[in-house]
Amino acid sequence: MRERLLAAERVKAIEWRDGTLRLLDQRLLPQEEVWLEHESAAEVAKAIRDMVVRGAPAIGISAAYGIVLGARARLAQGGDWRAALEEDFRLLADSRPTAVNLFWALNRMRDRLERMKEGDQPLAVLEAEAISIHESDREANLTMAQLGMELIRKQQGSPQNILTHCNTGALATGGFGTALGVIRAAHLEGLVNRIYADETRPWLQGSRLTAWELANEGIPVSLNVDSAAAHLMKTENITWVIVGADRITANGDVANKIGTYQLAVNAMHHGVRFMVVAPSSTIDMNLESGEDIPIEERDGRELLEIGGRRVAAEVDAYNPVFDVTPADLIDAIVTERGVVERPDAERMAALMSRKRLH
């Protein structure tokens, strides 16, 4: 299966080339494929904040490379470069508050920095760590794809209709994808009849990115407005809703793109199974429940304007980027460490005590 999955890979969003971080500008897809080069931590932080790069794993990977770029600049300046590098850690940490992969990657880079020995080359050590973070995420995606596909096949061996939300493919990760990785694997095994992709307002990640990724691979996909999801579950024999996650707490609550919570509520009402796919770096065991997750809110103009023109006069906008789905609405959380069915605090703790499967 691994070889077939790798052969099917067509899209990537992050490149580390000759000491430069190259990011595919996802704001312009699918009309334009433009790669932007970043050579400083500040540029990477701005790219994360402005959503040049998005998706929790991809944000974490980009931040890790941002620290490499920051270290290069601080070392060139001389003096106490480690103290100066703390400003780059802070700048990157402030770029997006909800995706825990960002903080996980930064903590891993800081830990590696603190473990350096006398005689180590700081830049080489940090670069190797960032590359390891990137490669590990890609391997985790391949493992999760297999595990999630097996869950789908276990329920029903014939082709199924699946609903997904936002974008969780290669564009959101170090390669291949989380929820879309599972969908890709299921397609290769003949388990997909059709994928229904929520458009995902207001940034339209579903229509611009997910539909584009799936169509490029010949996977049958239909786009729907977000508010059609319950109707689809009622009329189109949807068997699974499969989504990613930006943060998962110790009890199994899941923060993901706004609209995920209502999908889970509707899925339970219609008897549709609900799967969350995310690497263990997304799990924050320091937070007891979803009530503790900071929810990012973005500029209301994302709702009030279309193409730079105001469409709703003299009103305010409420624009949270994420919501929290309670664990009791989730059938399975799939990670590279294994699968947790009907997640709760005890099962999540058991999962995190396991070694990685890949």
Swiss-Prot record:
EC number: 5.3.1.23
Catalytic activity: 5-(methylsulfanyl)-alpha-D-ribose 1-phosphate = 5-(methylsulfanyl)-D-ribulose 1-phosphate
Keyword Amino-acid biosynthesis: yes
A Pfam family matched in the record: IF-2B
The protein's enzyme class: isomerase
Residues the record marks as active site: 246 (proton donor)
The keyword Hydrolase is annotated on this UniProt entry: no
Key words, A-Z: Amino-acid biosynthesis, Isomerase, Methionine biosynthesis
Binding annotation for substrate: 54-56, 96, 205, 256-257
GO molecular function: S-methyl-5-thioribose-1-phosphate isomerase activity
Gene Ontology BP term (one): L-methionine salvage from methylthioadenosine
Purpose of the protein: Catalyzes the interconversion of methylthioribose-1-phosphate (MTR-1-P) into methylthioribulose-1-phosphate (MTRu-1-P).
Protein name: Methylthioribose-1-phosphate isomerase
Source organism of this protein record: Pseudomonas aeruginosa (strain ATCC 15692 / DSM 22644 / CIP 104116 / JCM 14847 / LMG 12228 / 1C / PRS 101 / PAO1)
